[in-house]
Amino acid sequence: MARYLGPKLKLSRREGTDLFLKSGVRAIDSKCKIEQAPGQHGARKPRLSDYGVQLREKQKVRRIYGVLERQFRNYYKEAARLKGNTGENLLALLEGRLDNVVYRMGFGATRAEARQLVSHKAIVVNGRVVNIASYQVSPNDVVSVREKAKKQSRVKAALELAEQREKPTWLEVDAAKMEGVFKRQPERSDLSADINEHLIVELYSK
């Protein structure tokens, strides 16, 4: 699948947040201030219309999870088809992606690194190797690092980094075994308040 290969810090500065989790892995150069807009001196951000605000929120969430436009729209369509709140359904689908679950369990330092582990066949789901990043993990699925990948220094480093983060309540992780259980889908209260999914629903509902 195609993926964005351009300057990631520039996108983070545009959205005003660490989209790609770089600051948790290494110190970001002081010249690359996330809160400052792209440009030599941080171009002044234009005043956005309602549509512009909705579009910017969609772009932010899409980039956080590393999903391209067509796939993101398909996630929205599936979320709208399911029972319940469309915005919350959308976030649950994104959180259920295998690459995201691998990141949440602490096996990858960033979602991009977790996606690479999946594509390199380093991740096992219920005893079977799965190399599709968008694979939807279901409640009670067991996700683990493949035996021959457990010695990788990046996996060990990621687990150490994960110890500094708040542990997701919807997951159960045995760091020593490099194995975890997806106990349930996360509830809205479990996830970041920095995301306004209602704006995305408004955008796609037009």
UniProtKB/Swiss-Prot annotation:
Would you name any one GO CC term? small ribosomal subunit
One Pfam family name from the record? Ribosomal_S4
Tell me the GO molecular function terms. Answer: rRNA binding; structural constituent of ribosome
Residue ranges constituting the S4 RNA-binding domain according to the UniProt record: 96-156
Q: Keyword Membrane: yes or no?
A: no
GO:BP terms for this protein?
ribosomal small subunit biogenesis; translation
Q: Which residues cross the membrane?
A: none
Going by the UniProt record, its keywords in alphabetical order are: Ribonucleoprotein, Ribosomal protein, RNA-binding, rRNA-binding
NCBIfam families according to UniProt: PRK05327.1, rpsD_bact
Quaternary structure and interacting proteins, as annotated: Part of the 30S ribosomal subunit. Contacts protein S5. The interaction surface between S4 and S5 is involved in control of translational fidelity.
Q: What does this protein do?
A: One of the primary rRNA binding proteins, it binds directly to 16S rRNA where it nucleates assembly of the body of the 30S subunit.
What family does the database annotate?
Belongs to the universal ribosomal protein uS4 family.
- HAMAP family linked: Ribosomal_uS4_B
Q: What is this protein called?
A: Small ribosomal subunit protein uS4
Q: Please name the gene that encodes this protein.
A: rpsD
